[in-house]
Amino acid sequence: MARNSSMGKTRSIENFEVRHTGNSEAVPFVKQHHYSGRCHGGAMCWSLIDTKHDELIGVAAFVTPISENVRRSLWEDNKKEELKHHVTELHRFVTLDDTPHNTETWFLSRALKGLKDYKPKYKAVISFADETFGHVGTIYQALNAIYYGKSGSAKYYKDEDGNMRSPREGGYNVSNAEAKERGWTIHKRESKHRYVFLLPDPYESKEDVFEDMCVESLEYPKA
């Protein structure tokens, strides 16, 4: 959800379009409206456009996970090396608050299809719902994503502007002492709920993709 919005406009899904866009508008939009205040500069972005008002009202940003272990962890042992390159992550997803009911599921389903069309190699898209901010993944559940449990708890920093900062910045581990020197405060991050969307090739089914995975499909968490 967005941190703020353009209230007062009447919007209709009939006027919405999903477009694969560059980062020059999409990334600043995410930084302004996503609760984290941050977005990877190299993300693959799909934008939600309100054509009636010629306005950007949402962004889905995908980034390949830096950690090879994260990408490998989805697959059975005999598939880990082959399929680790077929995983990406829904890095940021945000829409303005004044969009109609079901906008988020409508938008995300089309962004995922757009991603598969653009990069057919991707078979799995992982996404995390952050309990620290009260998220359980309701949108992902509505799109039948596979829920495969929680990550471990961790820490994060907040900078002087209130933006979240990762303990790993630009490939460099930031210690607690260094964070304090920068004026950052230390916070505990609760576990994240882990989901994966399956993107089968035309000759496959979702069941075919899931057969190569080692994760267990669990019951959805409730808010």
What does each of the following model-derived ranges do?
Residues 2-41:
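Short amphipathic alpha-helix that is part of the acyltransferase structural core
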